Curated annotation (Swiss-Prot):
There is a cross-link at L11-P20 (Cyclopeptide (Leu-Pro)). Probable toxin that belongs to the MSDIN-like toxin family responsible for a large number of food poisoning cases and deaths. Residues 1-10, 21-34 form a propeptide. Processed by the macrocyclase-peptidase enzyme POPB to yield a toxic cyclic decapeptide. POPB first removes 10 residues from the N-terminus. Conformational trapping of the remaining peptide forces the enzyme to release this intermediate rather than proceed to macrocyclization. The enzyme rebinds the remaining peptide in a different conformation and catalyzes macrocyclization of the N-terminal 10 residues. GO terms for molecular function: toxin activity. NCBIfam families: amanitin. This is MSDIN-like toxin proprotein 4. Keywords: Toxin. It comes from Amanita bisporigera. Belongs to the MSDIN fungal toxin family.
Length: 34
């Protein structure tokens, strides 16, 4: 995961409250979007 995605992930959902499946989905969307 790139630094940009790492910085943007917390803006979508707090990592502590983010289920793994949701985290993977967001990461996939961001990676595909970039």
């Amino acid at each position: 995961m790139s630094d940009i995605n790492t910085a943007r992930l917390p803006l979508f959902l707090p990592p502590v409250r983010m289920p793994p499946c949701v985290g993977d989905d967001i990461e996939m969307v961001l990676t595909r979007g970039e």
